[in-house]
Amino acid sequence: MVSYNESIYYDRAFHSQDIAGSIAWARANHKGGILSAAEFSAIESGLEKVEKEWAAGTFKIIPGVDEDIHTANERRLGELIGKEIGGKLHTGRSRNEQVATDMRMWLRDELRKIETYLSDFLRVIAARAEKEVDYVMPGYTHLQRAQPIRWSHWMLSYGMAFASDLERLREVIARVNLSPLGCGALAGNPFNIDRQMMAKELGFEGLLWNSMAAVSSRDFVVEALQWGATLMGHMSRWAEDLIIYRYFLFL
């Protein structure tokens, strides 16, 4: 059952987001009077050391002990600064909100990378279409020559598809980039923690206002996957056209 319940070998991908969220949480608990300045400083510096271990590839996962990325980071923090102070990090926080926060931050960060790649790709398409506007080629329907077209016209037909993908991606990112931190297990936080401050520190654009929905919903993951399927459908068409056009019969 221990091995069955472990998710550390999957959610360790969230290590940076988990640590950033924990630092923001500790800062908010310090502001709320739960942690002293010295305790917050120790927790912050300890978590920064844990992040350096992950970055250097020296963090040691302990099978059977580190159930998930949250327990792994907190276990290591306690080893570095002592369990008495390290154990205070989790005061008032639930892993329900913690994993939802990690997932949203990680997904947002990865989608923004794709956003950059897709924007660059669109610029290349536009530049090539402008440069090669005088190239003429056969236009095909059902693999039969139908009408003469410009190479740039073909290029920009995919440019429109990818531009729509980019627009939809930005809409997905906007819905992903909302903070559940401070929502507790399902009914909020009893210590009047500053959710706005934490959201701003972690780069969220706003808050999820219903605590039960915030910690239980995973529709943002499904929406990102749906978007990715649409993008790959366009990429597949693009690739298939290029494969077909490499044969002399089609040029």
What residue ranges belong to the model's regions?
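A helix-coil-helix interface module used to build multimeric assemblies
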Residues: 1-188, 193-200
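Acidic, glycine-rich loop-and-beta core segments that form the ion-binding/anion-interacting portion
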Residues: 202-251
